[in-house]
Amino acid sequence: MAKNTQRTMPVLPLRDVVVFPYMVMPLFVGRAKSINALEEAMNDDKQILLVSQREADLEEPTPEDLFDVGTIANIIQLLKLPDDTVKVLVEGQNRAKINSLEDGEKCFSAQITPIETTYGDEKELVVAKSAVLSEFENYLTLNKKVPTDILNALQRIDDVDRLADTMAAHLPVSIRHKQNALELANVQERLEYLLGMMESEADILQVEKRIRGRVKKQMEKSQRNYYLNEQIKAIRKEMDGGENEDTIDEVEQLHQKVEAAGMPADVRDKVENELQKLKMMSAMSSEATVIRSYIEWMIQVPWHQRSKVKKDIVKAQQVLDTDHYGLDRVKERILEYLAVQARLNKVKGPILCLVGPPGVGKTSLGQSIANATGRKYVRMALGGVRDEAEIRGHRKTYIGALPGKLIQKMAKVGVKNPLFLLDEIDKMASDMRGDPASALLEVLDPEQNTTFNDHYLEVDYDLSDVMFVATSNSMNIPGPLLDRMEVIRLSGYTEDEKLNIAMRHLLAKQIERNGLKKGELTVEESAILDIIRYYTREAGVRGLEREISKICRKAVKNLLVNPKLKSITVNSDNLHDYLGVKRFEFGKADTQNRIGEVTGLAWTEVGGDLLTIETASVVGKGKLSFTGSLGDVMKESIQAAMTVVRARADKLGINAEFHEKRDIHIHVPDGATPKDGPSAGIAMCTALISCLTGNPVRADVAMTGEISLRGKVLPIGGLKEKLLAAHRGGIKTVLIPKENVKDLEEIPENVKQNLAIHAVETIDEVLGFALENPPEGIEFVKVEAKPKAPRRKVTSKSERAVN
């Protein structure tokens, strides 16, 4: 093939390197198009066009970003590496002019014309060769970066074309200068260009040497740390009027960013020292990479940037009310907190910790607080975190070291005063790598977090402007950490609250997400109420939202399958067509008064429920047994109730010997569900008295309260959930401990209006409300045992013989 024949071949763009003919060079290739170009070349004639990029930092270059002249190279060896990159060994052959360059889907391809080398006058070539070698030798004495053995290798090259290309390849000059040498097909012109370039570089090196000496003499010992900066200034002063560089070097760029970052004086001194180290290092050294990464992190961390905080409490209340239905006490406490912060213009104060079951809006409440105050929002999930370095970071001496997640999040959000949500703070763990909860102590203590020290940064960072809010599902938080936070409890939503949330927010949200138009789907309140009661059992509304989403999906399918159907209405009658059979049944009050059967009230993580307690008495020897997956505390409560009954047996008219002649069995149905706690004490005691007196218990009465050995009714927890369960189950009268009257303020008005709530102090008051009649004892009939026939003595043969 003639050298001037046009041909098409794949193109490999190069960054920071120019490959000359006669050069053998390894290349590391990682870009997909470049790898495709190599594969195409390997499948053809193993030749590829190597072209340098005009800008080395371009990841995806266009045809305009490549030079017009490249080098045709043979692929000697190609090796695929484990990280999906490719190492290829190439040998330059000859120059080529790009006539047209196409950016294909797989790779670049170019239509090229090989460039024929010309030599010029032979005598002038000899003179130029001698001058170039002489100047190169002089250049080596000034620039110690070029190995001296290259001169010996160049002197052994007879071919002037190869000599010029080899010398150009080894000169430490810019890519632009090397590309200019590559584009010169005439050898004489190329040698003259190299000669001029080396003379210019030698002049600069001479000036640099002279300046360095002069600056060194002028500096005192106290100024030695600034030696390199003075050197650069002197060089620029000497070069005034010359050709300016197109770009500022990397160190100077970092220096400008450090100045703009607004760091405190001590932090800036630390970073300046690191910059000085970086200037004296080779850019390719591993330590330079570590220092560069450290400085970039220090620049990214916000030192003075702040977002403007809103102080309009009325507007904040509107935002909270719009985003969350109910939660009045929680929102009131948050507004109090924001009001104090607005008045003091500081964030210092208690760290809020929102504690409640899943799905009640803890995380979204944190987002709403950020919206209400105008702060940027950043969230850090602590679930499963067990390494202290996740909070404090790794020391930068470790390979791959990074700041802790706290500093990383601050760098990402870009301001000093965001709302920082520590999500699932109770899910942290600890192991041999440290205890992240202990690391958080410094973060959450207002007296200490002004000087938070990340192991990677190695300087103090002020976190006092950050508004921290934590969330947790339980109080299972280390004591010292809990002591630094103010707990705000979010109980489960009431039935009315769930209904309102579904009708106002969830339904519209799911209709939009599932592509339904306005009017195509109507879900009545009765259907939502049935979903809450029979298809979900939760404290929050996540399950409720999933069920509504299921209805929307089925509605979309039905509308597409039946084009004549224009709209769908879902109510309690046809709900099972969309959600299937009912999954749950909530407790309902019995309609008949029964002996030994009492309705108690239970608290669960998903709300309250009715708890039926059954008692039976049979002839026996005074054995007390209990079944129904009862916990230790509940078993002890039964024993306490039995002692109360025995102590009051005479007063209640119960045969004092019942505990010797009767077996008592207490059973709590739904035996597969574990039950525990002391709050069923008065219910257990009432059931025992009803059983032993034959006096029925009113079916419309439910009760909750712990019993003491002296018959006093002690306070309990979860009153709100228990009263909601009683209201839902059709109970008319509820007995609660007198000490829990203060908790009635939290109960919705509609619930209190529909329940007759009586506060009781003793078991006597409980019996007055719960029993159908005043308690009277039962005379247990003594069962006479039939006389047994005398046992006949059996004698052995030997005994008979004796007698």
UniProtKB/Swiss-Prot annotation:
Q: What SMART domains does the record tag this protein with?
A: AAA, LON
> A Pfam family name for this chain?
LON_substr_bdg
Question: What is the protein's species of origin?
Answer: Haemophilus influenzae (strain ATCC 51907 / DSM 11121 / KW20 / Rd)
- Tell me the subunit arrangement: Homohexamer. Organized in a ring with a central cavity.
* Record-stated family: Belongs to the peptidase S16 family.
Which residues does the entry assign to the active site, renumbered to this chain? S679, K722
- UniProt-listed CDD domains: RecA-like_Lon
State what protein this is by name: Lon protease
Q: Which reaction does it catalyse?
A: Hydrolysis of proteins in presence of ATP
Using the UniProt record, name the top-level EC class of this enzyme in a single word: hydrolase
Q: Which PANTHER family match?
A: ATP DEPENDENT LON PROTEASE FAMILY MEMBER
Ribosomal protein as UniProt keyword = no
Q: Where is the Lon N-terminal domain?
A: 9-202
State the conditions that upregulate or repress this gene. By heat shock.
Instruction: Please tell me whether the keyword Methyltransferase is annotated for this protein.
Output: no
Query: Which domain of life does the UniProt lineage start with?
Result: Bacteria
Q: Name one GO biological process term.
A: protein quality control for misfolded or incompletely synthesized proteins
Coiled coil regions, renumbered to chain: none
Q: List the GO terms this entry assigns under cellular component, sorted alphabetically.
A: cytoplasm
Sorted UniProt keywords: ATP-binding, Cytoplasm, Hydrolase, Nucleotide-binding, Protease, Serine protease, Stress response
Which InterPro entries has this protein been placed in? AAA+_ATPase, ATPase_AAA_core, Lon_bac, Lon_bac/euk-typ, Lon_lid, Lon_proteolytic, Lon_Prtase, Lon_prtase_N
Q: Lon proteolytic domain spans which residues?
A: 592-773
HAMAP family attached here? lon_bact
